[in-house]
Amino acid sequence: FLREMEFNRLLSSAISAYGQPKLEGSKNDDQNLEKQQKINNKNYYLIDDLGQIDKWIKEAEEAGEVVVDTETTSLDPHQADLVGISLCSKIGKACYIPVGHKSSKCIDKNAVIKKLKGLLEDPSVKKIGQNIKFDFIILYRHGITLSSMEDTMLMSYVLDAGKNRHNMDILSEIHLDHKTISFKEMVGTGKKEINFSEVELDKAKDYAAEDADITLRLYKKFLKNLKLEKMVNIYEIFEKPLIKILAFMEIEGVEIDKMFLKSLSSKFEKKIKKLEKEVFKISKKEFNIASPKQLGEIIYNDLKIAGLKKTKKGSFATSASVLEDLAFKGHEFPKLILDWRQVSKLKNTYSDALPEHINPNTKRVHTSFLLAATTTGRLASSDPNLQNIPIKSEDGKDIRKAFTAKKDHLLISADYNQIEMRILADLAEVKELKKAFKNNEDIHSLTASQIFNIDIKKVNQDHRRKAKAINFGIIYGISQYGLAKQINVSNYEAEEFLNSYFAKFPEIKVYMDSTIKFCRKSGYVNNIFGRRSHFNGINDKNFNVRNFQERAAINAPIQGSASEVMRLAMIRLDKRLSDQNRSSSKMLLQIHDELIFEVPKKDEKVMIKLIKDEMTSVAQSDYHSFSTPLTVDINVGDNWGMLH
């Protein structure tokens, strides 16, 4: 939840305080499925002759399914070299085809690709993988377009989102009671670490063939569990189609202005130096601002601007939340530290780091979209993470200006307007909100008029600002203290605002209470479309853990439903672009409620209409009909910064 909400600064302390989720699988996993065959390498084969591949192809065609797993020189699918391919169509029997090892026994890579192309592109044979999007990109770069893909990672995610992570090692332990051969065992660590291409073939065979074997076993289990849990539709409708769509978005990448980022780094460096001077002027001595220990000594011992506060480990408390509390009380020093941290992060994480992500071949940045990283179904991104670029500050907005359209093209931003508020109105059956959305009223002004008990025509900017904070705060389970800090009022006033809000919109309070009650009983919540988000700590004895999980449970159906709407929109748009043969217009990025497209300038008007039509039509889909309309804000520009 912290990661999804972009509360990244709290993530480390939350894990430290409460630990990682326990490893547990879906309830029907071991009770209703046959005992698995013992896992060993007895029938794992190393292919050292091109002709041997034929019988594996035949076996796959007869089975109608085959696990495909690639081994590579790196985890970057856009630059990695192919080292080998493993195949498995029968539990306990798998092979490994080495094509890029430093060994004379390797088979010619091009010959292997040519041999496997027919099978791997055959739509009548299922291609099963664990995070198969990675393998899709690797093989696509080698001239193979995988078809009919299945993904055990996504199957696990649909079944157990929020219960555990979904990487193969963990899934094997949970569902198969088997500890896999680790990647570290193959390549080592530290100074002794080698590339996978240097691993001995027999060892590589056991590792790669086991991966394929494990994947097939997991696939068989998850397929049955999806049926037992009645979750097949979530997997088939919302997960599988996104594999290829996101893969092509990643392959396309986005152009960034390297020189502009360089100038930003210079600008940020000057800001950092200026802030440091102001900090040292107050502290009356220089110190390492990045050191929590040294910073704590200044705050608590030298300046004495707060009573001594320490973490559980006994160190000085200098987290963002602590500094925000002190800044809220009027202290200048912690505010300067927060500003210094923000500018330093922008420089280190974005303006300095983004150029390092430019692919030397494509000259573009290729993020990785993560389908199974959140509890709610919301997408995430990494390497680089393009979903957490700050937008509230001017400096954060400047980072977005570095993302540009290529020559003779424009960027189009399509952003769902207040989608989570619309979904809340739909979920909780809030009559006043649904009416306001249907009449295209300003929802924040309406809320202000209700909670401040004034005519909507008399609502001023301050009223609206506070109402907006309450509206969005409710979605994320904001506390009265959190609201007080956000809108700069007393705790008492914040409590009164919340009480007034629930009095005017009682359906929302009913929704919140009933959602928590259901989650306490079942351990999960459902979104509008039926996806489950599990919350293991909803009944925890620790108040802080329980309270945090309750807020997350309230938010999950809202955020999850919004994510599903976005997934459906992406699927529709991909089909529409394909049907109309608009290959020159590309879907580049998905940033929460926003899609970014790169389109030819000549197609601007046509594409705006096409995008808007498809995204708004999701409101009346075969899977759910919303009682509130979905609206989309469209912006066009030469760079991402111009779109906001």
State where each predicted segment sits.
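C-terminal polymerase-core module
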Residues: 274-277, 281-335, 503-555, 598, ...
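Basic, low-complexity segments
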Residues: 407, 418-457
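Short active-site loop/helix that positions an aromatic residue
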Residues: 75-76, 85, 133-144, 155-159, ...
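Acidic beta-strand-to-loop metal/phosphate-binding motif
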Residues: 67, 124-132, 411-413
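Conserved "right-hand" nucleotidyltransferase catalytic core of DNA-directed polymerases
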Residues: 1-100, 147, 163, 171, ...
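Nucleic-acid-processing active sites and adjacent nucleic-acid-binding tracks
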Residues: 90-127
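Conserved catalytic core of nucleic-acid polymerases
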Residues: 194-197, 244, 251, 359, ...
